[in-house]
């Protein structure tokens, strides 16, 4: 009787042991394409709950040592590798079973989830010989990206040089060129917007999602227009200005842009003219010398991304009432008269002395945050007038900031959005208060950018356009519901409210109903940044 009691105790201690599986010890957030699922028995006679099919591993007889990745054990069996389970009680009825005396078995999980034991197969993420895919839909484009901003914006992106066969292979391909593997919305050469990490290994739900193969059709379909009414290369309306641009940021802000050296006669000719100078053909909102904002691909051919964001150019006329190519908000057309008065002083005498170049980037600013060398945030006018570049740098450094020469001397923002009227936005005073950002006088001098009046006409705080009472008149007059806010600066995925707001609270509730935030914007489209360059050394 004692012998039976001791044997029963030994049997219980052996069958209830749960071994540690080194192959499944990582974080669930880290893609691991080697593991396509696990076969874990939940009770007597149960079927596996993971991704591997039942009956995939078969043992040949008592005492055998299977080498497959998934093993099951009857009472008295302990396993030390692979995916394991223990089933005290009746023998399961599936083919993943064996019976026999207490035995120790070992197994090794292979990269392709195919074990070496007899009659063993399993399925999971694509292995060697297959192709790795990003999820179907919006994030279907495989990209290797150099810079990730807050997990929202990925820059300096390109397609992988070879087709990945798995999540780990995708990571390795990108890591070899010093980049990160991403699944992106826009397959734009040199950059991509709205990226997420690629799915590999055991994504939520077990099975790897399908998707479009690399180099497939970009989202959006056909290019805008066909024969645009405004000319042969750019559509009429907001995006009517043909420009050759060197740098594309997010498919939205195009930098280092110039007017084509000659008038293009077609979309192909436009592309060729710009390519001759190492630039890209773009149709832009504001043709500012040295840079341009809010560009799209020209008419003709299949540009990356297809249609411009949101389909037709929003609004028709830009903020301020004048159409593109005419007078921009504030009076003189940007870049039209390079000797016109710049914010703060004459461009031939940059503000504060010889510290910033004349023209567009003439505003000396001390900035706290630099994003990718493009967007400078939390900026203020230097506490005293710099006398030299070294003095400029030291003045800013004393406040823990960096010396910058900026286009728009606006404190602490880049997309040019502000909170709507009504309530107290972060920072205390609501938009449209008597003092502009940065103090009693706007940065750059006693007059705001563009001359004595702020861009767009009346200063914020006047009567809102159309009497909607949610956004100030002038520069920030466009009510928008925006999805993503980056640093309180860049607002992405914006659209006009579905109904006309009657108050600030109503505006907020309209946007909140679709999971967005209420904003008052300069340009009712995706966002761009302040556009700063380094001070003259």
From Swiss-Prot:
Residues 63-199 are annotated as: Hydrophobin 1. Gene3D superfamilies: Hydrophobin. It is found in: Secreted, Cell wall; Secreted. Residues 1-17 form the signal peptide. GO terms for cellular component: extracellular region. PROSITE patterns: PROKAR_LIPOPROTEIN. Glycans are attached at residues 70, 113. Homotetramer. Further self-assembles to form highly ordered films at water-air interfaces through intermolecular interactions. Contains four hydrophobin units with the same cysteine pattern CX9-CCX11-CX16-CX8-CCX10-C, which is a little different from HYD1 and HYD2, but corresponds to the consensus defined for the fungal class II hydrophobins. Aerial growth, conidiation, and dispersal of filamentous fungi in the environment rely upon a capability of their secreting small amphipathic proteins called hydrophobins (HPBs) with low sequence identity. Class I can self-assemble into an outermost layer of rodlet bundles on aerial cell surfaces, conferring cellular hydrophobicity that supports fungal growth, development and dispersal; whereas Class II form highly ordered films at water-air interfaces through intermolecular interactions but contribute nothing to the rodlet structure. This is Quadr-hydrophobin.
